[in-house]
Amino acid sequence: RTDDCKSNGEAEVGFVGRVLLNAFNAWEYGWESDRAELKENSLKVFDSYLKNGFTEAGFFKEFVNLDRNFEEPVHSIRRQSEGIYAMLHFLAYEKEQGRRHSEWEQRMKKMLDMFMQLQNQDGSFPRKFRDDFSIVDKSGGSTPSATLPLVMGYKYFKDKRYLDSAKKTADYLENELISKADYFSSTLDANCEDKEASLYAATATYYLALITKGEEHKHYADLTKKAAYFALSWYYLWDVPFAPGQMLGDIGLKTRGWGNVSVENNHIDVFIFEFASVLHWLSKEYKEPRFADFAEVISTSMRQLLPHDGHMCGIAKVGY
């Protein structure tokens, strides 16, 4: 809710929460800007999750409501992957500064090892599963979200098993998603064709292109380009008119450069994360300026809803 900004008791590791990534961003910015309160708050988040945020098997407690004493019993490869992704960013940053966090390293290595237990022969990952590894939703559409932490885990831990696992995910993506232009089941608020599956597929193959050379690099780059073109088809090239009284229309939002979500959820969405970086990279890799040009359209359009003095975008409190 933007109209009161009150806490709802929820903490979420991935998807719309990304609490660990928010903590890392605040941690990094806190060091860069000498903001002690940001560093303190970030450490509270990290320490709390290290102490209380793991299940018996060792997965993240990916969604909890502390007001209702509720823990989501079903895990998703999407949220689990995004939690590892955040913590590997934190650990890599800390390593560069000469600091190590052995308990977090052990936790992340254990999770990556458990990921390999979950991976199917065709390279896919189940969309949802329980703490005992039993499968709730076998759909492979969320597979590319796992590629990122596997590549990062290979870089951080120098364990080639993680790179091999990541390459298997790319085989699945190529055979079942990219070659068929059938991107599905990445988002968690619907189970259908969606933008984020193609966006994640492009980002996953981009990670593999960055870490490979020669023909293998070219193959992953070509897959990235193909998936990126499809992902861009979800983005508006025009400004949708709003009816009088709708909040976004009243503050003058222009929709060009915003993406739709899925065939079930017909609304615009800010989700992009590294996709703009992927587009800039593709622009250089293939000497195709349209990729970089549209990345700028996306970036500038989304900044319309960044609140600042005199332009709070309907948000009740400063700092939200």
Regions found by a protein language model. Name each.
Residues R1-Y320:
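Glycan-recognition and catalytic cores of secretory/periplasmic carbohydrate-active enzymes
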